[in-house]
Amino acid sequence: MPNCIVVVQFDLPKRSEELAVKGGTSTAPTYRGLATKGLIRKDYLNGESGTGGVYLWDSRESAQAWFTEERVAELTKRFGVRPRLTWYDTHVTVDNLKGETRVNGKAIEKATEAAA
């Protein structure tokens, strides 16, 4: 089963680094708690084209369980603008932190094997 990436974007102005870090660290505990619900990773976005997050889930089902219409309504209320959600299946991942390549979440090659 492929992992799922959801890109969430808000049409909002770029924040200062200080505000972006403050916002991210204040909500990080919520997302750390989602590890048991399939969230592998969340990266917070801050740029000229808006703000948001990139979520890597263990499956589309896990992502859909989190990103319900109720959740989108909650985010809309919090940020004052409705987010755009873009969904992707990801079949192949190169993870340089772990030194491996994964297919559908399963390691198929370690960095030492690739270098040989």
PLM features: what roles do these ranges have?
Residues 1-50, 60-68, 79-116:
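Short S/T/G/P-rich N-terminal loop/turn motif that feeds into the first structured element of a domain
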Residues 53-57:
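Conserved RNP beta-strands of RNA recognition motif
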Residues 73-79:
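Short arginine-rich
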